[in-house]
UniProtKB/Swiss-Prot annotation:
Skewed-composition ranges (Basic residues): 1029-1038
Region (Disordered): 130-261, 287-309, 325-388, 409-583, 598-895, 934-1316, 1350-1374, 1532-1552
Any one GO cellular component localisation term in the record: cytoplasm
Organism ancestry: Eukaryota, Metazoa, Chordata, Craniata, Vertebrata
PANTHER family, per database record: CENTROSOMAL PROTEIN OF 170 KDA (PTHR15715), CENTROSOMAL PROTEIN OF 170 KDA PROTEIN B (PTHR15715:SF18)
Basic and acidic residues bias locations: 147-156, 243-253, 330-344, 430-446, 467-476
InterPro entries listed in its UniProt record: Cent_Immune-Sig_Mod (IPR051176), CEP170_C (IPR029300), FHA_dom (IPR000253), SMAD_FHA_dom_sf (IPR008984)
Gene: CEP170B
Bias type Low complexity, positions: 478-489, 711-722, 1286-1301, 1542-1552
Listed name of the protein: Centrosomal protein of 170 kDa protein B
Cell compartment(s), UniProt: Cytoplasm, Cytoskeleton
Organism: Homo sapiens
Domain FHA: 23-73
Amino acid sequence: MSATSWFLVSSSGARHRLPRELIFVGREECELMLQSRSVDKQHAVINYDQDRDEHWVKDLGSLNGTFVNDMRIPDQKYVTLKLNDVIRFGYDSNMYVLERVQHRVPEEALKHEKYTSQLQVSVKGLAPKRSEALPEHTPYCEASNPRPEKGDRRPGTEAASYRTPLYGQPSWWGEDDGSTLPDAQRQGEPYPERPKGPVQQDGELHGFRAPAEPQGCSFRREPSYFEIPTKETPQPSQPPEVPAHEMPTKDAEAGGGGAAPVVQSHASFTIEFDDCSPGKMKIKDHITKFSLRQRRPPGKEATPGEMVSAETKVADWLVQNDPSLLHRVGPGDDRHSTKSDLPVHTRTLKGHKHEDGTQSDSEDPLAKAASAAGVPLEASGEQVRLQRQIKRDPQELLHNQQAFVIEFFDEDTPRKKRSQSFTHSPSGDPKADKRRGPTPADRDRPSVPAPVQAGGRSSGPQRAGSLKREKTEERLGSPSPASRTPARPFGSVGRRSRLAQDFMAQCLRESSPAARPSPEKVPPVLPAPLTPHGTSPVGPPTPPPAPTDPQLTKARKQEEDDSLSDAGTYTIETEAQDTEVEEARKMIDQVFGVLESPELSRASSATFRPVIRGDRDESDDGGVAQRMALLQEFASRPLGAAPQAEHQGLPVPGSPGGQKWVSRWASLADSYSDPGLTEDGLGRRGGEPEGSLPVRMRRRLPQLPSERADSPAGPESSRRSGPGPPELDSEQPSRLFGQEELDPDSLSDASGSDGGRGPEPGVEPQDSRRRSPQEGPTWSRGRRSPRAPGEPTPASFFIGDQNGDAVLSRKPLAAPGDGEGLGQTAQPSPPARDGVYVSANGRMVIQLRPGRSPEPDGPAPAFLRQESFTKEPASGPPAPGKPPHISSHPLLQDLAATRAARMDFHSQDTHLILKETETALAALEARLLSNSVDAECEGGSTPRPPEDALSGDSDVDTASTVSLRSGKSGPSPTTPQPLRAQKEMSPSPPAAQDPGGTALVSAREQSSERQHHPLGPTDMGRGEPVRRSAIRRGHRPRGSLDWPSEERGPVLAHLPSSDVMASNHETPEATGAGRLGSRRKPAAPPPSPAAREEQSRSSASSQKGPQALTRSNSLSTPRPTRASRLRRARLGDASDTEAADGERGSLGNPEPVGRPAAEQAKKLSRLDILAMPRKRAGSFTGTSDPEAAPARTSFSGRSVELCCASRKPTMAEARAVSRKAANTATTTGPRQPFSRARSGSARYTSNTRRRQQGSDYTSTSEEEYGSRHGSPKHTRSHTSTATQTPRAGSSSRARSRAPGPRDTDDDEEEPDPYGFIVQTAEIAEIARLSQTLVKDVAILAQEIHDVAGDGDTLGSSEPAHSASLSNMPSTPASTISAREELVQRIPEASLNFQKVPPGSLNSRDFDQNMNDSCEDALANKTRPRNREEVIFDNLMLNPVSQLSQAIRENTEHLAEKMKILFQNTGRAWEDLEARINAENEVPILKTSNKEISSILKELRRVQKQLEVINAIVDPSGSLDLLTGNRSLASSAQPGLGKGRVAAQSPPSPASAEALLPALPLRNFPQRASCGPPSLPDPTFLPDAERFLI
């Protein structure tokens, strides 16, 4: 039988068989891959004419052209290639000569598997065998006689294999040359193509090429390229091999060639997994991007073929059934390129002996190394392939979930890095791992016989489990570092690419919709199954497995990391065994809010990650039973022993799939792990890994019962909170199962939203109450209630003490003090001071300052969220009265002078995450405070929590911890707190203590994730997966479970308590403004989410009760906030609700009023700063007008609003409409009250009221969210208003605009700028924030301007009422929905808006100076033209325009000089200028008067410049403090900065927080609010000052 094979023989001698089909030639993803840069990605096409048996080449319009015989062929036109034509693609160094090999395929060859592979599906199996078994290959190719034929084929194939220019096909083409190779060999034997080595060429090349083809098909299942060709070459199947490899039927199918055309070779893009030569393991068609790695044992010749053949069959079968198992290309594997450009693959080709970069399998150093590794190359190849495969396709692995633990210890030596996947299958296949892991024998076995497993293949799966366990243990810190080492490979695999992780997370979520909490809950599920298997043994056995081959494991981990990184889809494990690396990663994680401390990362992540995967799956597939069994076992386990078992057992499930894997998508899970460890779900998940799996389970199950029993939801809570000790035994199986399904998420989601949340919250509160004295509402303790009070679950909650925050997770049985301190972090008892709250995300750690912790304010300091994000508390506990510093994001850090404490954070890098954290922390804080209060009320241990309960009640203040601390203690007396405590305990207990941590963390994580989503940049690594999962969760109807009707539902879906609170402001959070929103909003939301939880879990009455309680606690306006939020979300009419909501949401308002103005200003100002931009963000949804009005009060709310925009754009829209309606109504009605409240009262009080009112009238608007949700934000807003007199005044006025009477307020506020002196520190803070904001805002302003250039003006008009700054961010959003309002207020809006970006304050000050009507944005409707008139009259357009131009010029000169003076801030200048310019671009007025617009633009520019100057000159705001009065000069800007920075500060924080996180959503508003508020504020203040002057 003769067949014609056409080859392109490169000048280097490499031969590339041309398949009888169209192939692409190019640099990427092409069958013939050339490495020359002159070759386009898709350069040319070579087609085949079956009738004429000739090939055509067509240049695909490549840049450098395609040359045939040195003649450039026309583009897009087929040119027939003749024999011996010289083809050159681009300027590739290789010239290809077209050669035709007429090879007669001997019968033997026809019988050869290569030919057979196409005919028989078993070819695939054969291929691996063959590759592995040279003997097979030899008989296969008849090394002696057929070898010439096959040799010919082989040379081509070989060249194709290692040198295949074709993307993947060259490999399989060359391999298919197995069929054509004989031809090539006969005819082209002379060709150096075969230089690789005759023997290897013969058997190996041939053998594994041919088999690889089928394999490629089967593995890839992508016959698109290769299966089509399979028909071409009927490869005579080699009877012996085919039967053996019937499994690779797919391959045969793919090959499909059957014994028809001999030349089919490429027909089935065969993946050459030559066990002997990994380099050879090329999928001819690159089809095996993952399969490439499958079988390329370096240097493996056919010698071990027989053994390999068996293994290969298995591996091939696995690969066929699990593409994820396909080999990954080894270092020596160069399947992608022809290696035409050697330098590209210098490293890869290092071992290649030939100039062209080709090398025979025998020459593959990696292969040889692998063979030398001591593992049979075949076994090694197979294992490597499996490992690679596992590693390769985490998602596929997830789906395929084949439990392959490939022993790479011995074989890994050469290919360890490439074959680290021994953990892949477990990690890659968490399900498989789970399934496997759940097997007691597996779990236990791996633990005990880990070494054996490491050594033996049979122990592979077990080892995978054990490794997982080890990893978990490592994370937990229970196993020795060595044990951690083995775990890491799994972690790596488990980590999977974020994509895979996200995918898995999503799949898991989808698989267990009911287990929506599953992401967090699932981990427990998985742990349960895993642990049950090794339940008792898991604890003890795990350590042995971890130690197993520690170095090997470590090496593998490193190698695996390498391979994972090479794959690019795998995220590097953070659970590095390397202490330094771990610490560095920990720091990074912490900075990014991931807070994956070694314990968290390892225990939580590892345990957690696979759990999520497996948990969901298991819950789907019956993991529930295992889970229940596991939980029961845990329950039965001794607490002391349980933790280890949990460490090992729980982490094991997650270990393979990964700690990072979960970490990423499950920042949720992680956060839930981190705090959740503390929490009941996390306790199980993260805590278990820490060493209290049983405890964790217990905590989780019974936690809520007693509290829930207390509240209407009590029964359900108890039922759900199986974790609690009381119900642990009885309910643990079912409860734990349910909770594992629901709790993990509920943990992260405050375990309230899904019915499973309720119990968690209830459980946590119950535990908190029980342990209140010791743990208070510490998530760790609360969740671990089953644990001895003193027995901390190390991984429970990464709220480690300052000293042991990271240790906590690691300490399986951390000292009670440590655990407690951590636990009490939530409940700022003395231990709490040291504790840090780690959001369920693991992203935010709320650090309760020990200093605060001492309850200086009693209840007020109870809730120290000084560092929303830091694991370790801030440098020093702030004064009890001082607000805990939430230096979650750089703005805050800068603001506080980065407040030494804040500086403790590693949040600078995690700017956005920190913002999220702020938001989440605010929510968490409020929750924890309320829960702490509840716990105190119930446990009486922590009086502060009751005080904070107020804060918790009005999470607004919680959002602004400061406001929470100082204001809430007073305004929200303990009386409401007990009610709230009960309310929160039952509805938001999850959010309160442990659940609060989890819920808040979950809310935070979700808010952070949602915010993060828009905010992609900061949390890109883990944040993104987290974001995705959070978003998935958010969009999943978890919160919806509680409030399905809510538009907020999607977000709420996953956060019952925290999510409800976060979900209510979830959009803001999602937008990234939600962080503040979360913080600000949670005070009210915790009850609301709690209430919703109650609703979902217990009953409407429960919710009503908490709401009623919240209502009773007028100071903490959680229920109205919640109700308003719900209304807004559901009905979009927050107007009436907001009135109460504004008041309630203005928890901070009374609070701020109660507080010293300066303190309020400072606390609120910083929070305001953070919150205001959030408000703005909210505005982006187009709810700006009403929102803007309260935006001042609730910048954060606004920010939240914008965040909400992502989550509830529709709601935002509805709200925007509602706001318009409400604004019109409220503008007349509430606005006057606002005016009164604000004008008559102290700025704070007025602001508070205005905030309340603003919230009221903006109840429809997202700002209402902010106001309701973020009382602190409102407080902050009003503080901002007070603090940033011009801006705050503007804000006030802006609000006033919403409430017409506010105009008076504007007047009142006008003097306030001087009153800002009191808030000097705050102003300095604001100045710092404004600096940061200026940078961020500059960028954001540009983006916003680009996005909403004109919208800003519109937004401004709406926000104008709410202070251009405050509303500006929200204005753009608001602008969208409130354009009608804008129309009404256009004159003022335009002025305001123009003021907002460049002179939000400036314009305001200017307005105040010229006309208080500048603030009439609120009163815009009342006197929309007044402002214009005032502007016209005051500016006297021409003179004003000239003046503004002169001012602008002078300001620019000054800015230039300042830039020179502050060159180190040049970048900041540029950024600021860019942002400012972008803002200036924003249409200032919707005024027909172009002169006014130009003036406004000029002034805006001036404002921007001044802001830049202010930021540069006085980044710390110290000058602002010195400058009590507004100055025209840049120095005055700091003075103005007080007012301006203060005024600007709220937008600034919002800007940084909302803008950065929600920049995408709020681009326009942010620019308006962020850029202009932060930049324009100083600028505007100076401008305003100038005008005033």
